[in-house]
From Swiss-Prot:
Signal peptide start and end residues: 1-16
UniProt entry keywords in alphabetical sequence: Heme, Iron, Metal-binding, Oxygen transport, Signal, Transport
Family per similarity comment: Belongs to the globin family.
Protein name, as recorded: Globin CTT-Z
Pfam families: Globin
Length: 163
């Protein structure tokens, strides 16, 4: 039990540098431009990193272009994008840190139990940022805001995944 208390404190510490209101606004406005493109986002991730697609039993070994139009693919893409949408909606307010922690903790634990590696998390991040930056107005300020946001999330997730 003591271990989990220490882990929780470490995770809270990792997200204790919340986005400023300006950063949160940049992340929220850019996300609003792409969050309805769930299928395209997941397609981009799988296309760039087939090893990630291979981690999903329902998609492993299947032609990406043929599964892109399936209901199963759309459903899973929506789950992933909804997770980010919820985190982003909560960002920018320190009063939401415990809610953010809860979401990140559950996601990190779920993915640790599935054997997802830090490398695969980083691949996902790279593909996600590539998709967003290619589909919104992307300047240094937006890039910095997304880097801060994702650094917070990934620092916390990696503490869980490597524990």
């Amino acid at each position: 039990m003591k271990f989990f208390a220490v882990l929780a404190l470490c995770i809270v510490g990792a997200i204790a540098h919340p986005l400023t209101s300006d950063e949160a606004a940049l992340v929220k406005s850019s996300w609003a431009q792409v969050k309805h493109n769930e299928v395209d986002i997941l397609y981009t991730v799988f296309k760039a990193y087939p090893d990630i697609q291979a981690r999903f039993p329902q998609f492993a070994g299947k032609d990406l272009d043929s599964i892109k139009t399936s209901g199963q693919f759309a459903t899973h893409a929506t789950r992933i994008v909804s997770f980010f949408s919820e985190l982003i909606a909560l960002s920018g307010s320190e009063s939401n840190l415990s809610a953010i922690y809860g979401l990140i903790s559950k996601m990190g634990t779920d993915h640790k139990n599935r054997g997802i590696t830090q490398t695969q998390f980083n691949e996902f991040r790279t593909a996600l940022v590539s998709y967003i930056s290619s589909n919104v107005s992307w300047g240094d300020n937006v890039a910095a805001a997304w880097t801060h946001a994702l650094d917070n999330v990934y620092t916390a997730v990696f503490q869980i995944v490597t524990a």
